[in-house]
Amino acid sequence: GDYVIFHELTHLLDTANLGAGDQKKNAMVRGFLEYHASQIETIKILGYESIGENISFSMKQQVETVASIKSMQNFVDEPANTAKSLLRRSDFPKDLETLLTTAALIFNYYGRRSICLMHAQDYREDVDIIEFSEFIGTAQLAALDTFL
């Protein structure tokens, strides 16, 4: 899907604009980059070209991902569910890569979720975010909601 290309291009653009440097050294910048790229990919997977369009959709709407066709609800919840399974591993965090991947998945979920909060007719919060708050911090996650 071309939504993946738009996700990665957003990372490139944001990195250039923010002068982010080494992403592994700045977790919040890395988090924002993932959050924003996930917003763009969500708009794109829904078939919209721009945030300026009149975006409206149902969480039951089917979207085609690289792996399969799934509902928007499943598309949005997928990174959260993967992050939760990583957080619940007895050896978490096994290594730096696992730690960074888990954080990226959480920010990815928040980016997708933000588009749903703003534009879905029937969005419901299915994911319990308590584990995310404990991992990333309540204040940081609350700050993401200010971007809505």
Feature map (PLM): residue ranges:
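Post-HExxH zinc-binding segment in Zn-dependent metallohydrolases
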Residues: K25-E64
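Pan-zinc metallopeptidase signature
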Residues: S71-L148
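Active-site recognition of the HExxH zinc-binding catalytic motif
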Residues: D2-G19
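Hydrophobic, Leu/Ile/Phe/Ala-enriched alpha-helical segments that form helix-helix packing faces
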Residues: L9, L13, E41, I45, ...
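Short catalytic/ligand-binding loop motif for oxyanion handling, primarily in non-cytosolic enzymes
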Residues: L13, G21-Q23, F32
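Short alpha-helix boundary/capping elements
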Residues: L13-D14, I45, E49, G111-S114
